[in-house]
Amino acid sequence: MALATVMAANAQKFVFKGSVKTADGKAIQGVVVNNGTDFTTTDAKGQWTLCTDTCVSKFVQISTPADYVLPKSKSIAKGFYVSVGQLVKDKCRHNFVLQPRDTKDNTFYYIAISDPQVKNDKHMELWRSQTVEDLKATTDALSKEHEVVTMTLGDIVWDNMQLFDDYAESIQQLPITAFQCIGNHDFDRRYQALNNMPYGSGVYGEQAYCTHFGPTDYSFNIAGVHVVTLKNINYMGKKGYREQFTEAQLAWLRRDLSYVPKGSMVIINMHAALWNPVEKEGNVLNANDLKSVLRGYRVHIFNGHTHFFHNNTVGNDIYEHNIGAACGAWWRGDVNRCGAPNGYLVVKASADSLTSQYKPTGGDYAQQMRVYSKGEFLSQPYSVVANVWDCDSLTTVEWYEDGQYRGKMTQFTDSDERYLQSRGSHVKECVTTHLFKATPAWGSHKVKVVVKNRFGQVHTETVDVNRAWLKALSSDKRPKVIAHRGYWRYEGAVQNSLSSLRASAQAGVYGSEFDVQITADGEVIVNHDPHLGGLPIAKSTYAQLVKARLGNGEPIPTLAKYLDEAKKHKDLKIILEIKKQANDSVEAVLVRKTLEAVKASGLSSRVQYISFSQFVCDQIIRNDKTADVAYLGGNMSPKEVKEHGFSGIDYSMDVLRVHPEWIDKAHKLGLTVNVWTIATEEHLKFVTTLHPDFITTDIPEDALRMLSKGNNK
C-alpha cells in the first residue's frame, strides 16, 4: 500500500522544458522562470527546465523582463504562464514568446482597483456603467503619455464565479494590460485553497480564478520597477479564511526577489491589508514576516479588502496604500465605509519615484476631499469638517476664515457623515482617522480648506459656513417648534409649570411638552423627575407632596389643572409624556388615569402622547385607537414602530445621527419625526437640515425666529 502511494505521488512529477524567445526565434537569456516553488533562468539559447510536482504546482510562469512588452489577450494579462495540464498535453514542453519594446519608456501608469465585488447582473451593470466607463476616459488619456497597467486587488466577484467571464469582457476594449489578484470572495466556497486540500486533489478553491487569470503569485518588470502579486487569503472553504501568507509563499517571494537588485523599486499587490490600524482584526497575521523579506527594497504595497482608505508608512522604505473600493460600500451608494468616494488609485511610477492620486468614479482628480459646512456633520455641529481620504503623516490640512489664515485643522476619529446617511441599516458603522475639523467664529461666511500631500500636490475647497442651513430654509419642510417642558426660559417661568405653558402659547409655538408621574394614592401630577421635594413620587401620597413648590413659587400642578389651563390656549398642541414607572402594573394605572383626564378635559384632539416606555405606548393604543402616540426610546426602527401602531418616532439627535436613514424611512411609512432636545442655535441649524416634522427645544423663541420664513403652525 505504501509503495503504491509513493508511485502514485511520483507519477505527478514531470520534467518540463521549453524556451523564451521572440516571435522571430531570437533567444532571450536570463529570463526568470518558476513553477510556484522552484526557479531557474533561461540559458544563452533561451532554454529552461523545471522538475515540477503537478499536485503542488499548477503553472509554469515567467517574470517578463522590462525590455519586453507585457503579453496580453483582449487587455487581460496572458501569455506569461502555462498550466501544468497544458504542459502535460504538449509533451511537457512550452515556448514563451515575447515582443521586444519598440522604444524604452522609463515611466508607466499603474492603476490599482480594489474590490469590484460584483454579485449579480445588477452589480455588473453598475461596474460597467460607472467604473469601466470612468476607466475608459482615464486610460484613453493616460495611454497617450505612457503605458497603462491595471491591477484589480481581489474580490473581483462576490462568491459568483460565473461572473469572471463578464468581468474580463467588460474591460477588453480598454488600452491597458490588466492583471488580477485573488480575494476571499474569488474562491469557490465549496473547497479549501490548494495548500489546504488533500495532496493530489483534483479540485480546489482558487481553481476557477486560475482558469481565467492564471497563477495567484507572480511577478513582472516594467520601467525599472519589479511588480509582484501575492495571495494573502488562506482559504478554508465555506467562506472561512485567514488573512495570511503561507511559508511556501514567503519562500517563493525570497526566491523571486533574489533576482532583483537591492535598492530597487518594488510594487507588491495583495488583497488584505497588512498594517491598517483602524480594523486590526482584518490585517494579515504574519505581516512582519513579509516585512523581513522586503528589507533592502523601496516598496509600495497596494491592497483593498477593507472598503475604506488608509495609508501607512512602515519604516523608511515601505509604504502601504490600503485604497477605497470600486464598489464602495458594496454598491449601496457612492462612498466607501470611510466616506471616500468609489474609485481607484492612479499611480505614476518609475525606477526612481512613485506618485499617486485617487480618482473618484464620475469625479475628477481635483476631488481629493469632502468638506462639510457647519451643521452638516452631526457630531461636530459647530465645525467645518474635511474628509481627506488619501492622506498620511506628511499631509497638511489648513484653513482660512473669510480670507484670514487660521492654521492647521484638528484631526479626529469618527464615522463619516456621508457614509452614515448612505449605508444600509445592516451594514456596520466604520470609523476613520482622516477627518479634520475647524470651528469658525459666529458671523463668519466662508471657510477655505487647503490640503497639501506628500508629493506637493495642493487641493483647495471653499464652503459657505451657512450652506446647510440656508438650503434647509429654502425648503417647505421646516420643522414645527415644540417647547421642551414649556417655555421655561421665559421670565418668571419654570419647567413643567402653568407659567411655562402660558409662555409657550404666547410665543406662538406649535406645541408645549410636559411630563406626568403618578403618586402612591393615584394622583397624576406634572413633574419630570421621579422625586419631588426629596420624596419619591411613586411612594408618596399627593397630600405629602402638595406642599412642595416649583422654583418660581408655583404649586406642583395636577394633570387636571394643567389641562384646564391648556383649554385657554386653543391653538396650542399638548405634548404629553408619560414617564416610565417601576413596573407594568403602575404604568397601566398611569395610562388609564391620564387618558381619563384628557377625555374629561375635552382635549383629546389636541393631545399627542409620547413615552420612553414601549409598554406605555402599547397601552395608550390599546385603550384609545385614535390616540396620536410617538415612541421616545430610540431602539426601534421605523418599521417596528409602525408595526406597533404608533404614529411617530421621537428620537434624540444622537440616535438619528447613527440612523439618519430612519427619518426618510419613517416618512415613507407615514410616521412623523420629532428630534430632541435642541439647546443651541447651532444644533437647530443642523437638525433642520435633516427635515424632521418637529423639534423639541429649550429655545423656542429663538427657533421660531430662525425658522421665520413661512408659517410655522
Predicted regions and their residues:
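Binuclear metal-dependent phosphoesterase catalytic core
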Residues: 318-391, 395-401, 433-461
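Phosphate-group recognition and catalysis centered on beta-loop-alpha active-site segments
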Residues: 386, 466-713
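Extended active-site neighborhood of metal-dependent phosphoesterases/phosphodiesterases
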Residues: 66-67, 72-73, 85, 161-262, ...
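Short, ordered, surface-exposed loop/turn motifs in non-cytosolic proteins
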Residues: 14-37, 54-55
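A short, solvent-exposed loop/turn motif at the edges and junctions
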Residues: 35, 55-83
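Hydrophobic beta-strand segments
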Residues: 31-35, 60, 397-399
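Short, acidic Ser/Thr/Gly-rich low-complexity loop/linker segments typical of extracellular
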Residues: 37-53, 410-411
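N-terminal active-site segment of His-dependent metallophosphoesterases
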Residues: 13-16, 24, 73-164
